A protein has these predicted regions:
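Sec-dependent bacterial lipoprotein signal peptides
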Residues: 1-19
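A sequence/structural signal for flexible, mid-protein segments enriched
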Residues: 21-287
């Protein structure tokens, strides 16, 4: 037995050496420009600029992610009146933790905003229009009958808006005990035909990539800040593909390996104008 082990050792060493010489098949993937940006009615633009992280067989560290942030990009937002270069700054609690913004241009419903990003060799452009502002008439907040630790939210909307072609409505939210930034509400996207007189639209829990025990309802520890927005056609298409990806990512029967339907020419990502209204909700009294 000892002799067999000694004879096998050189083969094992050779196998390890051979494996170390095998080239990572994804190591030469060319990075692409990635733009994530939005401008709300009555608020200032926010833009993040990175390069795509290639598929790889090796582990990815936080250092690797930071190296994909393009801090020296020139980011410009233009409307019908002026063109403004945004200022780069550290943004704590964001991913990535560095972005671009300005107080010299503010979103207004009915106005169109062009985004330009230059960081040689990359150049990207995108255009978005902020639709009329969405308004919720009232919210109904009720305990869940099946679980006394959870509650559910319904939004009552009667407003009929003339939205851009292909546009729609979306809910975002913040749980004040857990979040700093808005997150997408699960299945929170609605077409105009869903907004009939006095409908009750369910507002589901927030999508968190690290949440392995998801419930569509909210915990009694959640004090909510809900943003109800209108979207133009390209913005709706992006969030529609995002929700498809989230919904199907856990299914073994459907593939979700396609890119999201962004509206950035010259790169990946989105530039969205939001006609937004913000509401604060408290948990109901426990039954």
């Amino acid at each position: 037995m000892v002799v067999l082990c000694k004879n096998a050792l050189p083969l094992l060493v050779a196998a390890i050496a051979l494996a170390s010489c095998v080239e990572d098949p994804y190591s030469h993937t060319q990075p692409q420009l990635v733009v994530e940006g939005w401008i709300d009615d009555g608020d200032f633009p926010t833009v993040f600029v990175t390069t795509s992280l290639p598929f790889t067989t090796s582990d990815t560290t936080d250092v690797d992610l930071v190296q994909h942030v393009l801090k020296w990009a020139t980011v410009t937002v233009s409307d019908e009146e002026k063109s403004v270069v945004l200022t780069g700054r550290v943004m704590k609690h964001q991913t990535p933790p560095y972005g671009f913004t300005t107080t010299r241009i503010m979103g207004r419903s009915g106005h169109t905003y062009k985004l330009t990003v230059d960081c040689p060799p990359y150049h990207a452009e995108a255009v978005t229009t902020i639709p009329p502002k969405a308004v919720v008439d009232s919210f109904t907040v009720t305990p869940c009958l099946e679980n006394d630790t959870l509650y559910q939210v319904m939004a009552h909307v009667s407003q009929q808006l003339d939205l851009p072609q292909g546009g729609g409505y979306k809910f975002f939210g913040i749980s004040k005990c857990r979040d700093v930034n808005y997150k997408s509400c699960y299945m929170g996207l609605y077409k105009p035909e869903n907004i009939s007189p006095h409908p009750a639209l369910p507002v589901y829990n927030l999508h968190r990539p690290d949440n392995r025990h998801f419930s569509p309802f909210f915990s009694y520890s959640d004090t909510l800040k809900i943003k109800f927005t209108t979207l133009d056609g390209p913005s709706y298409a992006f969030w529609d593909s995002f929700e498809d990806d989230v919904s199907l990512s856990g299914s073994p029967f459907f593939s979700t390996n396609s890119n999201l339907r962004g509206n950035v020419s010259g790169g990946l990502g989105y530039w969205c104008g939001y006609g937004s209204s913000v509401y604060y909700l408290l948990p109901p009294k426990k039954p």
